[in-house]
Amino acid sequence: DNDPTNGGVSNCNGGCATSWPPLLVTDGVASGVADLASITRSDGTEQVTYAGRPLYFYISDNTVGDTNGDSPTGTWHKVDYSQLYAPLFDNTSVLEPDTQYETADALVTRWSDRPRTRHAREDQFQSYDHYVKFYFEDRSTSIEIVDYVAKGGTNIEMNVRTIWPLNATEAENRWWYAGPSATYHWNSIMDYMGSEVIDGTTYYHYQKTGDFYRNANTRGIQMGDRLEFEVSQFSAPGITNGQLNYYGTVFLYIVGEGIVPWYAKTGDEASEKIPEEYWLGGDTTIHYQYSDEPNDNFLQMATNLGYDNGQTFLLGRRVHHSSFVSGAHDEDPENGVLSSNAGLTGPRYINERCSDCHERNGGASVVANGELLDRWVFKVGDANGNPHPNLGSVLQPKGSASEGNVSIASWTESNGLRSPNYQFAGVTPDTFSARIAPRLVGLGLLEAIVEADIEALADPTDLNGDGVSGRVNVVTDAVTGQNRIGRFGWKAAQPSVRHQAASALNTDIGVRTSMFPSLDCGSAQTNCNGSAPQMPEENLDTLTLYLSALGVRPQRVWQNGVADQDVLQGRELFRNIGCVGCHTETFQTSEFHPLAEVRDQTIHPYSDMLLHDMGPGLADTLSEGTATGAEWRTTPLWGLGLAACVTGGVINPTGAEGGESCTPHHAYLHDGRARSIEEAILWHGGEGQAANDAYQGLLESDKQLMLRFLESL
């Protein structure tokens, strides 16, 4: 114990360091625990310090939990520490069942599906990716494939479970794609296997088994065969609401492997597996869209949605699309009223549905000057950045106690870029931050990224000298009081999907939950909570599952079975000019996340989940927690190239079936100021300035390649 008590230096070198190995840091920063730092040792290595004093291992401590060095003579002491943040999930987390497992004689894959109006390749109808009327009433399906071929057997068994019985003469299960469009080699009615009651719900079971490839006159099934199939969800008469006849999702099962996202080959449109490097959302990745419904890209179930989660997903979607004022569904009045949503809003709010801001699960649009920004969120504060006494922390323009509204008065143009100037009607806050609703896809995957992997990317003091100094936003868990890494929101203010959903319900819709039981309120305001009850816990559960299990489209680089070289060249330019300094390509998600859909997946979000100072050009006047006005969380880029058609929607000039076309609306960055992806790049300042400068230095042809890459995401 020869180090000075005031720390700052290690006197343990040579033989001492052999017996008392120093705890070293190799990635430039000691982190994860409060009061950690580092010193430079005599050999040039960086040693971790705690409260200024160097840390060592004792040579007899070999495994976690060893305390041999805690000497009664005082030559060694264990260090008690407080963790900087608590992980969301660890080895004590309760895990939902895996979507795939092995038995002694089979590979078993289990997942969920929903009804479709038409088939995946029928662009003439544009009716595959939308949601049918009453999608939430007894119309989810669970599918199980028992693959005996994978273990040396000869047949494949497919079991289908429904909540409403299928029509005995139309419960068709089509196997082995033949083409064109929706034609299969083997169409047959599934065998009815009986029903069972689980937790008060009656389930109906159907089965199809086969041991031949395509048809009975060919060979047997072999490893690697591509079994494309589609289950007809034709309901038996008597279902409460809606039509009886529906189709299902087109799935591709690779014998011996599992369900995979697919592309349609040029010519016969036969399905093939998309290379895994283009599965942006890991196993949640859905197939390419061939039904020409560009506004519906962000609405889809994860391909690997859990066997027991299909109905929960659909019920959560209903919560998302139903008014918290009247309970009415926004897509079709025939979908009726969700009574458990009705009457939950307090005296003030921004909008009455989640989908009113996140239309089609995309971002909000930028409206004309003078029009109310009623799909935006304005965080507000007093001169010191604290909640405004007359407004609270968020401007809420609707309800019986409206706080006023805001619109864009004009734009300031400079060098081809524009920034908005706002006009408030009512109280003008001293400080504020304008936010459009972000895209919702991939949220569960972002929640599943391991905290240590996020923190490993942080370099708050720019030790490596690359000009990028991202940092984690450590926030307080509103439920447990623990410190956690913030992940969601423009400034990473919430740690989980559930926290983010409950926070938005509170400030944006004026709905109280068990997580946030008190509504937003300024010190000079009264009757903030009103008399509305809290949101039912079950509805918050289903909404969280829905938001967590939305599928991600694959990178659009392989639609025709050959890699688009322009996209790949653009990817190299993106890497080479430094964009990946913030837009991290790849993570492996946690093995401890409760949801199998997002657990232990390789994903490509193109975000480091860190806060970065983006310079004065993008700064607002309001901080949020520890995030300054100039700091923003790196936005994930998956879905970027699809966003304009989702936000803008479609028009149908003729009204004829199949006549819809995209009306793109380009609105990028936190306030939608960027009218193109290139403008968004050119707005990058601060830590993003070097990459911006490098982009501007590219040849025009190289700029177009890089934009092509970004549009492919």
What are these regions (language model features)?
Residues 84-713:
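Periplasmic c-type cytochrome electron-transfer domains
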